[in-house]
Regions:
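Acidic, polar-rich N-terminal leader regions of halophilic archaeal proteins
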Residues: 1-310
Length: 310
């Protein structure tokens, strides 16, 4: 451990390209062996304030990797990540990745989402850059999975963002509402109209999560009328169609649907969300799944028109 810390000290004195290159190597190691980073998170966190923004971004991505695979290792740097998220002068991609890391930490360790962090996540949905909003919504869904109680009084405010142009924002927020509704279904009353409007959402996974949330409300003591049309026949992907069908069936009163496909189950949500996000962000054919722009075969890993990462 002491030798590794000494190496990190020497790395801080190296040039920016060397720092960035070595941190990428460290991130690759973290993907394979995250447990070896125990007690190294704090020394690594000093690179979050590096003078070079590419170094800061690489470090933030490193902590996303650690927070997702071995959250206990990254837990000591919650404050450092929160400071980057709260810094309006910080490069927005750095803040986006810090929000993502904080979300993974909150899912595993709910106390990591302090009231101040939660406020930054919620407020940023209204004012931040589009790329950051996606990660803020993702982090909020993880907060809800870790402790749904934290968002039960914020449903109305968050529901206002279900009209976002970004389908990932809509997906993550409807997912957060399902997580809240699994424990506090009555809390969803504050967002019922916005959830009903998602019956016409262009994305079948968003429609499915909205149906799931409304189903939780309908299966409680709350009397709620549900949309009858959810566009089930218009879905081309078999996986997306199955996802939507089971949740619409649940919403319309089929309790058996929950047992069949893990509907209205937070563990299932946690296990399947990354796969669903990949399905949403993977372009069909040659176009961007968000704005439809034609994409070159060997172009950058993001849409040059709307900025959606792939």
């Amino acid at each position: 451990h002491e030798e590794t810390v000494a190496c990190l000290d020497r790395l801080r004195a190296a040039g920016a390209e060397a720092r960035k290159r070595e941190l990428r190597v460290i991130r690759d190691v973290a993907e394979e062996r995250p447990t070896v980073f125990e007690a190294l998170a704090v020394p690594l966190a000093t690179f979050l304030t590096d003078e070079n923004r590419a170094v800061r971004l690489t470090t933030a991505k490193l902590f996303v990797t650690l927070a997702q695979s071995e959250p206990t290792v990254a837990l000591p740097v919650v404050d450092a990540l929160a400071d980057r998220l709260a810094d309006d002068e910080e490069f927005y991609y750095v803040r986006a990745r810090c929000a993502e890391a904080l979300g993974y930490l909150a899912a595993a360790h709910p106390s990591a989402a302090t009231p101040e962090i939660l406020a930054d996540l919620r407020i940023g949905l209204s004012f931040d850059e589009p790329e950051v909003k996606t990660k803020l919504a993702k982090a909020l869904s993880h907060v809800a999975l870790g402790n749904p109680r934290r968002l039960r009084h914020h449903v109305e405010d968050l529901a206002a963002h279900l009209e976002s142009d970004d389908e990932l924002v809509r997906y993550h927020l409807t997912t957060a509402f399902v997580a809240v509704g699994c424990t506090y279904p009555d809390a969803l009353v504050a967002g019922v109209d916005a959830l009903k409007d998602r019956a016409n959402d262009p994305n079948p996974y968003v429609r499915g999560r909205a149906a799931e949330a409304l189903g939780l409300l309908g299966h409680s003591d709350v009397d709620v009328s549900l949309p009858e049309q959810w566009g089930r026949d218009a879905v081309e992907s078999e996986a997306a169609a199955d996802f939507l069908d089971m949740r619409v069936a649940f919403a319309l009163g089929d309790r058996a649907a929950a047992a069949v496909d893990g509907v209205a189950d937070t563990e299932s949500i946690h296990d399947t969300t990354e796969e669903i996000v990949e399905a949403i962000t993977t372009p069909d054919g040659d176009g961007c799944p968000n704005c439809g722009l034609g994409l070159p075969e060997n172009g950058p890993p993001f849409c040059p028109q709307c900025g959606r990462p792939f």
